[in-house]
Amino acid sequence: MAKQSMKNRELKRQRTVAKFAQKRAALKAIIASPESTPEARWEAQVALQKQPRDASASRLRNRCRLTGRPHGVYRKFGLARNMLRQAAMRGDVPGLVKASW
């Protein structure tokens, strides 16, 4: 199990990313637009840099929903490999069967 503080930190980051998503997208559009003036582009870059560091989506980490484990997490299920195995053995994951050949 991951520490509760790490889980809470990740939830706080998710909320921050969601809060600033539209504003970041607008600023990035100004920066990437070939029609924008150099001054507008510069102001957009400065405004983007002044936003909180955790507002960037690249700061998010996929964690297991049950344990908070940061590594070995399957995106499709949102579970770490060991929790996915336990859930599959219990039959909690529909359509997932143990491989045999």
UniProtKB/Swiss-Prot annotation:
A GO CC term assigned to this protein in UniProt: cytoplasm
Gene3D superfamilies referenced in this protein's UniProt entry, alphabetically: 1.10.287.1480
SUPFAM superfamilies: Glucocorticoid receptor-like (DNA-binding domain)
A Gene Ontology BP annotation from the UniProt entry: translation
GO molecular function, one term: structural constituent of ribosome
InterPro entries registered for this protein in UniProt: Ribosomal_uS14, Ribosomal_uS14_bac/plastid
UniProt keyword terms in alphabetical order: Ribonucleoprotein, Ribosomal protein, RNA-binding, rRNA-binding
The keyword Ribosomal protein belongs to this UniProt entry's keyword annotation: yes
Protein family according to the UniProt entry: Belongs to the universal ribosomal protein uS14 family.
Function: Binds 16S rRNA, required for the assembly of 30S particles and may also be responsible for determining the conformation of the 16S rRNA at the A site.
Cross-referenced NCBIfam families: PRK08881.1
Subunit composition and interactions: Part of the 30S ribosomal subunit. Contacts proteins S3 and S10.
PANTHER family: 30S RIBOSOMAL PROTEIN S14 (PTHR19836), SMALL RIBOSOMAL SUBUNIT PROTEIN US14M (PTHR19836:SF19)
Protein name according to UniProt: Small ribosomal subunit protein uS14
Organism: Stutzerimonas stutzeri (strain A1501)
